[in-house]
Amino acid sequence: MHGLLLAAGLLSLPLHVLAHPQPSTSTSLAGRAGAVDLNEFRIAHRSSYTSHDEMKKLPSIASFRQGTYLEVATELVKQTMPNMEFRLVDDHYVGDSGIGHVRFRQTMHGIDIDNSDFNVNVGKDGKVLSHGNSFYTGPAPSSNPMVKRDFIDPMQALHGVRKALNLPIKADGAHVEDMSEHKVMFKGTSGALSDPTAKLCYMAKEDGSLALTWRVETDIGDNWLLSYMDAKESSKVHNVVDYVAHATFQVYKWGLADPTEGKREIITNPWNLKTSPLTWLSDGHNNYTATRGNNAIAQYNPDGGNDYENNYRPSPKNLKFEYPYSPDMNPPKTYIDASVTELFYTSNICHDLYYMLGFNEKAGNFQVNNRGQGGKGNDFVILNAQDGSGTNNANFATPPDGQPGRMRAYIWTRANPPRDASFEAGTIIHEYTHGLSNRLCGGPANSRCLNALESGGMGEGWGDFYATAVRLKPNDTRKTNYVKGGWVNNSPKGVRMYPYSTDMNVNPLVYTSNNKLNEVHAIGTVWCTMLYEVLWNLIDKHGKNDGPVPIFENGVPNDGKYLAMKIVMDGMAIQPCNPNFVQARDAILDADMNLTKGANKCEIWKGFAKRGLGVGAKFDPKNRTGSTQVPNECK
């Protein structure tokens, strides 16, 4: 997992905008008595698509004036839908394949028609590649409803939705606060995870007419609903969109490093709605039935190419990502559905856990839609399973914030039958952590801060550290040793010089070992060995949470494992560009000072000092000085 520029390898290297809302496959409001069947409120399919071949037959396209992809897209909409009122949706971007994606929302009297959209795809040559259209073409309202305001108020709409859908929301005593001209927020409600909102908008109906509605948004956990209540009649709900899709994944559950540690399970809705509120199968523009969503897009990539959007990915009926797999199956392509599913699952869990620990939108995480939380969006992780560009490895490319990360998981040929890296969670976690460290060190806009030998080595070490911390088992102690990459490499020794261990007889590495090392993975093994010592010092002091997520008390994880993961992550953001071991150690100490007021100073110092990075340690690229000393207050 090499950190040169954008590549890393295991061994070498504001609001939700619904452009084309597609309801989830959920058929009812989850987990409640008297639940309403949401299939009754699905939005009808109205969109058309003009392909590239069809576009070439349209002579008017040739007359388009040259300009930016936004100008070209806007001109197309003007020519295709003359005299229509519309606005540009603020989520346009150019994908890594060079296609400019632009979306427009139709409006009437300045009010959105919420299910009337026009999306334009502009190629690298500046010409329209294709477009989709669901603009409303029926009769327009004769007058602006904002003039007479002869519609129900938003509070009536909220009460109407509560009653019609049997929602567990109480609004007695609630009041309305304006957010914009057509949107309000309800304050003082209970039963929802966030304050409900209502937006005045039109909905194009299946019968060809237009309805003025209040779009009431209610997040009740198992369901996140956009309910379109008729603005003239408070008992009529026209449509409902549920952001929450109920899906099952057959995978090796989080915490199992590889197939030798357990059996596959079927897990329902594995996402965390606090960190992935759109779930893993939606980006706020579309809900998907394949391995694609806000955080990642996973697919089969046998030719090893860079084009991914049209590659194969599993898309099961009823969102049941349940596919057969056994390590004895051969050839690997026979279980590609299971491989893509596993890769998608592990990477999304990484997203959710790292988000909890601080790798959020502002920090430069990987998401298409940042929902107004800061940072730059349009940068999910592209996940290529059984990538044909190599073997016996895996890698991760980390461009600056706003550009997608890319992970390639290869087939390993050191066993018979070959082994698929997607099924070794430790490998995938290591790769994803390259994205974490490269975005945090130097800031989201600079992915060039882990490219010196020692800092590049730490990039490898962080990947091993997080992969190892995640795989700790309930009965593990500081005497437990772990190897890295043992399963994929078909070797009990794994792919590192030594196992990760607190026993100096098992792993003798110290800071001055770096004087004889000139390769990032070897140096990374030294760094992770030090972090493993710190990890167990903190676990011995605070205990170990064996659950899949941390428990915070006043912003601090209440156990040693997640505390170590938190302060190591915070240290990445604190340290300078291209740090050395001494600077990174100090950054972790500073992170603990900031988080706990230095309550763990001695545990951290003792962990580093045991491995020669004590008080007197000094960096010199050719002659590092080691030290086992700790501050006087820690003796």
Curated annotation (Swiss-Prot):
Cofactor(s) listed: Zn(2+)
Statement: the UniProt record of this protein carries the keyword Hydrolase: yes
Keyword Nucleotide-binding assigned: no
GO cellular component terms attached to this protein's record: extracellular region
Keyword field: Glycoprotein, Hydrolase, Metal-binding, Metalloprotease, Protease, Secreted, Signal, Virulence, Zinc, Zymogen
Residue ranges listed under propeptide: 20-246
Binding site for Zn(2+): 430, 434
Cofactor stoichiometry and binding remark: Binds 1 zinc ion per subunit.
Domain of life the protein comes from: Eukaryota
EC identifiers of the protein: 3.4.24.-
Glycosylation sites: 287, 475, 594, 623
UniProt similarity note: Belongs to the peptidase M36 family.
Protein name: Extracellular metalloproteinase 1
Gene assigned in the entry: MEP1
